[in-house]
Amino acid sequence: MIPVFRPQLPKAAELLPYLKRIDEARWYSNFGPLHGEFRTRIARHYGLGDDQVVLVSNATVGIALALQAVALKRSAHQCICPSWTFAATPHAIALAGQSPVFADVDAATWTLDADQLAEQDIREASGVVMVSPFGAPIDMTKWERFAERNGIPVVCDAAASFDAIGREEFRIGTIPIVISLHATKPLAAAEGCIILCTDPDIIERIRQISNFGFSTTSVAQVLGTNAKLNEYNCAVGLASLDAWPETREKLTAMREYYWERLDEIPGLKVFGRGRSYVSNYMIIETETDGYQLSNHLAQRGIETRRWWRSGCHQHPAFTSFNVKPLPQTRRLGVHTLGLPFYSDLAKTDIDKIVDAVDEFCRPRAA
């Protein structure tokens, strides 16, 4: 069986220098030396200052903290988000004390379109969490204008977008951008989160909330929690950052080969085809039923994944929340499928995967 994904974190030898530094410092959490180094290197990677970056324990909590930090409209308790996302997005909204209101996504970009949100939803909303789908760039300028025009704070769930940020239209600004460091993400620390924002006050509020509401002393100034990123996860993150140029090169080469082969198949679209970013996903959209294609590939020893299933509004945990018709979400749930994609996937395996997809799709092409 060819697995749909195989995480690959830094090897023990690559971690050892950082682990030795932890042993020497005997500082294991609470903004230790590796935490400071990791934050500084991330800031330099994106051309930011240290005061424009904060690290927290995971991206689900990161979204919740960002929502708490951006001064949500207190008269409202409903936060707009796409249904076409991973369950962490609405869970984070609930953690922040809000109720998710699911909106449909644009047919081409697979993300919320600020110009298409319902006026009533906007009037009743405390905020918006828009999502970068599978690591794709987002037009942040458009969303900053939306936030200013409507007086509604916005947070960007960019869990898989480590590489896309700063490319194309995905610029860093006053909207907090939340990036996951989970083992399944392009840059991984096993678990963790990066939050970027050009407003140092928002970053400081997030840092404060993540540390029991403490500021300069151990006196809680605001309600908070414990969401600090420990030194061991920072060690993994630093080692991953050391290897990032090589990792990106491998992902790029594999992506290009996949694209070249998939282009041969009629009736097939590849999400993100031709874009400049890399991610850990290879998502196809077919004219046929994705469930049937998944079964066809499974019979040939190829694992696939409907990464976002049929949308979050279909999950039992979220069915009690306000849901309108979501035709694009429904379409994507039926017609999209995640193919195997990871840094050491062999070309021979890609050939086997694409040949099996072609075998199913070609006879059914319109």
Language-model regions, residue ranges each:
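Conserved PLP-anchoring active-site segment centered on the Schiff-base-forming lysine
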Residues: A66-D121, H296-L297
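Helix C-cap/helix->beta junction micro-motif
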Residues: A96, R149-N150, R300
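Phosphate-binding glycine-rich loop
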Residues: W27, G36-Q78, A92-A94, F102-D104
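PLP-dependent aminotransferase class I/II
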Residues: L16, G36-V54, G127-V131, M140, ...
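Active-site phosphate-binding strand-loop segment of PLP-dependent enzymes
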Residues: A108-A189, L196, G338
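Aromatic/hydrophobic pocket-lining residues that form π-stacking "cages" and hydrophobic walls in ligand
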Residues: T89, W143, I206
